[in-house]
Amino acid sequence: MDPAGNPATGTARVKRGMAEMLKGGVIMDVVTPEQARIAEGAGAVAVMALERVPADIRAQGGVSRMSDPDMIEGIIAAVTIPVMAKVRIGHFVEAQILQTLGVDYIDESEVLTPADYAHHIDKWNFTVPFVCGATNLGEALRRISEGAAMIRSKGEAGTGDVSNATTHMRAIGGEIRRLTSMSEDELFVAAKELQAPYELVAEVARAGKLPVTLFTAGGIATPADAAMMMQLGAEGVFVGSGIFKSGAPEHRAAAIVKATTFFDDPDVLAKVSRGLGEAMVGINVDEIAVGHRLAQRGW
């Protein structure tokens, strides 16, 4: 409640609380209302509405922008779970449009073509919670200082190769653990190295975790991938091309949801990994020229 007794909306506490509600779940990319219904039926906690999944964006090239409002509204109408949508890095007007459309979360995404190579969106100006990607702790803290309510380790979207997701999750976790052993004067140096506000760095050092929910993304294509990322410290999973670019998407979606819930139970993981058909063929991250890697977008 605010001082006048009205419900608090758009505050950091409210927005972070909305992101916390998704913990332990799977968020799936969908391009049609039918896919959204499949995702909801499989147990997804939210869907990401976009016109092309990352694998298609990578294959087709060109400039990728915010999805058509009619398409987004069609998906909002098709499901009862929260709906996210992506905007280009720095494109605050796309974010204004999505907020007006009534999406539940906005993803300032490196998967789309950046609109601004120097500035990210000032997310404090919005009542809708934002999700942002990060490859390391400094990047995560900078996004949080701009108002992000959820961080996802980036991985390399649209590849089906989970190696970058593990690299980024381990980097964030390792840097957090390093902070927890530092003295106060060392934290000032760390804040300078991380290019992040000292207050946030000190908060992470005290808590041993980020002050917002940490999901993982990029290259997750199997139940085992999802479970591994959860064991590495993720609090939930984004799955993009890995479901609807694979065989038997309904079964694969449900299996990934179950693997995310029972990530530390090998018996369950073995059971849900059976009979899923062929996983997406994908592409090895090492085969992608550095200049074409999506994870490097942002700063």
Swiss-Prot record:
Keywords: Isopeptide bond, Lyase, Pyridoxal phosphate, Schiff base, Ubl conjugation
Protein's pathway: Cofactor biosynthesis; pyridoxal 5'-phosphate biosynthesis
Example GO molecular function: pyridoxal 5'-phosphate synthase (glutamine hydrolysing) activity
Annotated D-glyceraldehyde 3-phosphate binding sites: 170
Documented EC number(s): 4.3.3.6
Top EC category: lyase
Record-level GO cellular component terms: plasma membrane
InterPro entries, alphabetized: Aldolase_TIM, PdxS/SNZ, PdxS/SNZ_N, RibuloseP-bd_barrel
Lineage: superkingdom: Bacteria
Residue(s) of cross-link: Isoglutamyl lysine isopeptide (Lys-Gln) (interchain with Q-Cter in protein Pup): 271
UniProt cross-references to Gene3D superfamilies, sorted A to Z: Aldolase class I
Pfam families assigned to the protein according to its UniProt record, in alphabetical order: SOR_SNZ (PF01680)
Entry annotation: catalytic residues: 86
Disulfide bonds: none
Similarity comment text for this entry: Belongs to the PdxS/SNZ family.
Summary of subunit composition and partner proteins: In the presence of PdxT, forms a dodecamer of heterodimers.
Known function: Catalyzes the formation of pyridoxal 5'-phosphate from ribose 5-phosphate (RBP), glyceraldehyde 3-phosphate (G3P) and ammonia. The ammonia is provided by the PdxT subunit. Can also use ribulose 5-phosphate and dihydroxyacetone phosphate as substrates, resulting from enzyme-catalyzed isomerization of RBP and G3P, respectively.
HAMAP family: PdxS
PANTHER family membership: PYRIDOXAL 5'-PHOSPHATE SYNTHASE SUBUNIT SNZ1-RELATED (PTHR31829:SF0)
Protein name listed in UniProt: Pyridoxal 5'-phosphate synthase subunit PdxS
Gene: pdxS
